[in-house]
């Protein structure tokens, strides 16, 4: 009797353990992402822990939960709790009296605005705005960089270098800087676009100042400058921290180099020259398999092999015929990279060699002058396969597809917003997207 009980207990325990392992492997135990706090999502890698999505999308379009009129801009959307935060540009037209007190003339006030909406209703919770004339800034629709939410604060950077740290509760200011006036900043041709990066208790930003003021690190709580490094001009790419041999370095892609600096003090570690036309170092570097990959437009892609020591790195391969990205962020999975090439569309290639396997012949998004699609990997609840993506293309179409080394296959497509280059946010079973006129919250169809 006692032995039988023990046997049953052991068997039950083994079954429970086995079920737990299966649950982890199949995704049943996965925690869904309720927040999208930074550029490219909770892990900063363009992956979304999502519910299992249905392939059957309504012909009349996906249901819009709410829509809110906003101003222009390319800034992505960030979400924490019930707060949806992004940036736009507001132009206030008016009149002012001339000195004689009788005549009037037209006036225009240009503002950059950080604003917060309620996730459930779209109602505005707060807004923080400041004067920011754009002058002759090209593509001057509005701010470019997605807000960075960290705990109870949100960090933003405007197109011409206004860096703000705000309280997420009410939008009141904690600290602020003007990168151009205060730190020798040189805005890129199309304005600052790299979001602030939080590393430990530092806020890392690209200023592009000479004399060692390209990369700046500020104290997260006080805004005090802690260190500064490099003298390159600023690009548009997000710095990436990586841990190697017990040491953290920041990989930075500037218009003239692929570099790494010490994440704690800014000390330069290694540098590979790579001059990009018009300074368009845009996409965030992909770092896997001891390789740092950047994908440029006119001069193509470069893969850097990271050495054993923090100061060592060498060019592994380069390719400038088939692998030429611009704004669209490439994604990586299991040894392969998926890049939106300017001519051939979504393209799959091997990270280790740069060997191209296929392209989708511009199926995901139209070719156009500046092809764009914001692509995320789906880690879907209850699915064992890991090769599904969601992409918001330049036409405002949301596309559900399967992509792997074997090819590209579309499952569903629905237009949810006007043409846009801005990155959306994915939370729960919703996608939030913005254009120059509105911000929408759309519910996605979840499989039974």
Residue positions per predicted region:
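N-terminal secretory signal peptides that target proteins for export/translocation
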Residues: 1-7
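Noncatalytic, solvent-exposed loop/strand surfaces
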Residues: 27-448
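Bacterial N-terminal signal peptides
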Residues: 10-25
